[in-house]
Amino acid sequence: VVGTMHAWHAVSRGHEVVQIERESEARGASLRNFGQIWVSGRAGGEELETALRARELWESIAERVPDLGFRACGSLTPLRTDRETAVAEAAVARPDAAARGYKLLTAAEARAINPALRGDFRAALWCERDAAVEPRTAQLALKRELLASGRYTYLGGREVREVVGAASVRDDHGDVHTGDAVVLATGAWLGGLVRELAGPDLPVRRVRLQMMQTDALGEKLTTSVADADSFRYYPAYRGEALDALNAGQPQAPTAAEHRMQLLMVQRRDGGLTIGDTHEYEHPFAFDTVEEPYEHLTAVVESFLGRPLPRIRHRWAGVYAQCTDTGRVVHRQQVRDGVWLVTGPGGRGMTCSPAIAETTANELGW
């Protein structure tokens, strides 16, 4: 999605674009995520500003491309304990709380927004600015609109193998592509050409996650849903209240072992996308293991107050994250006319339109 959004901005500014994709169609982290446009947990400052701008862009792009499935659904984080509620209260007291759309709700107020939450909780953090798109189909929808411009060419099943000159690359079919600028949006593919161009000390790491999707819920889940473990992973919630939560209310053993939080979004077909885990140590395992799914199922059922529908899909994905997690993305000129853009971490789907807009502005497109 980072590469496609660069193409989008270039075409929108009147340029001709050739997009080269290693797979026949995108099938990496850009599809294997929640489709969340996640403003609520972002760090104050540049990261929040990027996420808010990206949300504006997603909404405006969706007016032209309704098949993105954009919806301004907001999110709810149900709360059960004093320590969890204290973190939410601290979030609502932030100076940028209004920009995020934070509001602390009673359980009754939360259920008025999302009636599917019939389980046990006593309050909830509402984040009005959060939104969602359909990750499995968004790339195809964007591609169709780009092709309709007449200034966009898509070459799937090709890999860029070499930079052969200023803003010029050769692919593995032997074809050379030359332009005014080349953007290498390689996602989690950090070896090979990326290593040759950026060197062995690229400040980006790979992160593996596990997720799942269910059959249709049979009713509407009107918001995205997170659990209070998400407070432990998103920088917006850092502070004394979170320190007290971590000290006095440890995660469940499975959640701690797999560095888990609950995030949940309903798809257009009614199914629920649910996750996730975080694995940082290399080499990654190649299995998907069952304990995280059991934990997530229990948490979701406790919020819904009903059994989870059958799990239809389970998968793992890998994304690239800057080792300095405060950086929104790694953007580096690696050769004359050639830029590497990677490492947005878990914010890639959220921030990609704004990341690409920044590249376009900096390069004077």
Language-model regions, residue ranges each:
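Hydrophobic/small residue at the entry helix of a nucleotide-binding pocket
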Residues: 1-2
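Glycine-rich FAD pyrophosphate-binding loop
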Residues: 11-31
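Dinucleotide-binding Rossmann-like beta1-alpha1 core, especially the glycine-rich loop
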Residues: 34-113
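Short beta-strand to alpha-helix junction loop
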Residues: 49-50, 77-87, 125-144, 287-292, ...
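Helix-loop-beta segment of a Rossmann-like dinucleotide-binding subdomain
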Residues: 67-77, 104, 111-149, 277-281, ...
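A conserved short coil-to-beta-strand element within the FAD-binding core of flavoproteins
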Residues: 153-168
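Flavin-dependent oxidoreductases
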Residues: 165, 171, 175-267, 282, ...
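C-terminal catalytic lobe of FAD-dependent flavoproteins
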Residues: 258-261, 267-273, 279-365
